[in-house]
Amino acid sequence: MSNYFNTLNLREKLDQLGRCRFMDRSEFSDGCNFLKGKKIVIVGCGAQGLNQGLNMRDSGLDISYALRKAAIEEKRPSFQRATENGFKVGTYEELIPTADLVINLTPDKQHSKVVSDVMPLMKQGAAFGYSHGFNIVEVGEQIREDITVVMSAPKCPGTEVREEYKRGFGVPTLIAVHPANDPKGEGMAIAKAWASATGGDRAGVLESSFVAEVKSDLMGEQTILCGMLQAGSIVCYDKLIADGKDPAYAGKLIQYGWETITEALKQGGITLMMDRLSNAAKLRAFELSEQIKEKLGFLYLKHMDDIISGEFSRVMMEDWANGDKDLLAWREATGKTAFENAPKADGIKISEQEYFDNGVLMVAMVKAGVEMAFDAMVASGIYEESAYYESLHELPLIANTIARKRLYEMNVVISDTAEYGNYLFSNVATPILAKEIIPALQKGDLGEPTPAVDIDNVTLRDVNDEIRNHPVELIGLELRGYMTDMKRISSQG
């Protein structure tokens, strides 16, 4: 097998990268009826597998779980999750042959094995589904010609897929049909019904491509969504301790600060986040964000280039073959950082506004990171809608995982693919920030409010205009209009 994207000519690459259409709600008037009465078998019962299955069952679909024989016999967590929720569970041999749609929701590194095991068991003309296209695009998996291959990719962790559905809403979702596998022309109908069954049509669905989903997803998770939050957490905590701040206070400011700050992003983009600051702090955050862009801009572009070329996937799959040696070493090192081991902040109260006032550097990191990730994707041929969802939109959801159990929780919730990319980025970004940004900080940048200064009206006007007119803000204003029922996700209350 070879990287599918690299087998395409330039015109085909640009076409696939640029596949992005926000679908009208009227296109989902039939809901998930296309899949009703069909047998749907999910392979894998992790966060996405379980929660998508729960939503689909509640939408009236026939859902069961195919697990490896050993997982059933040993009553592994996947078996327990499925059975405790009342699902039918069976081996591949028992369930796959009668399935009309098999959905592969196992980790990326298991996909090739799953495909080789289930493909001989699938009946003629069945469909095969993914929620991430890595196996098709980066591994270059060849699927039987009679099988329809589709994707429905919710843009958030599996737990949020369920919670949003339970409250009558949903999460934005990308859907796609693999152009090499749509023999009956039913792929889009299957993908639409699947997205509707998980609640995606209530929040907005983008018709995309496997290529656009993979390349944008990898870029977002490696840089702003995970890598920047990890690097920022480490250097900000270390700086607070160096300045003599109470370790418990410092830990809480960082742990819950990302979540509080990015909640403003969810409701009103970078503009609202910056508007939570005083005028003096806003100008300073803008200045810091420009400095961060100057120091880290090359790294964002390198990650984008390595994702487009397939170099990232090649290196990561080498680590897969080596027993995840690098991944496990980096995971262990993260667990030993000072931030991860900061004392609990029992009894320490930090108001919502204090997170902004004492976290100006963190606000600057978010602004710079979102804009750099968005710009790098768009410059590489990815449409603005996709770039928005993979940079700004998902950030509050990832920040929420840090609020729960710091970096450990973030790296547990995200995929191994995202975790590996996160370490590649943060391992380089952390020392750059520590050397180039932290030593030049001023009083009020982190850990205490920005001192009041005289404000020049023209300067403030120009900064406000620049913030509000960045392309990520313009497309975000449009897309958030489709998500009028977004709730707060704060774990703090």
Swiss-Prot record:
Residues annotated to bind NADP(+): C45, G46, A47, Q48, R68, R76, S78, D108, K109, Q110, G158
Residues the record lists as binding Mg(2+) 2: D217, E390, E394
KARI N-terminal Rossmann domain mapped to chain residues: 14-208
InterPro entries tied to this protein: 6-PGluconate_DH-like_C_sf, 6PGD_dom2, KARI, KARI_C, KARI_N, NAD(P)-bd_dom_sf
One Gene Ontology molecular-function label: ketol-acid reductoisomerase activity
BP GO annotations: isoleucine biosynthetic process; L-valine biosynthetic process
Keyword hit for DNA-binding: no
Chain positions recorded as substrate binding sites: S415
Pfam families (alphabetical): KARI_C, KARI_N
UniProt keyword annotation of Magnesium present: yes
Active site: H132
GO cellular component: cytosol
Signal peptide: none
Pathway listed: Amino-acid biosynthesis; L-isoleucine biosynthesis; L-isoleucine from 2-oxobutanoate: step 2/4; Amino-acid biosynthesis; L-valine biosynthesis; L-valine from pyruvate: step 2/4
Residues bound to Mg(2+) 1: D217, E221
Entries under PANTHER family matching the protein: KETOL-ACID REDUCTOISOMERASE, MITOCHONDRIAL (PTHR21371:SF1)
Family (UniProt): Belongs to the ketol-acid reductoisomerase family.
Protein name, as recorded: Ketol-acid reductoisomerase (NADP(+))
Source organism of this protein record: Actinobacillus succinogenes (strain ATCC 55618 / DSM 22257 / CCUG 43843 / 130Z)
Gene: ilvC
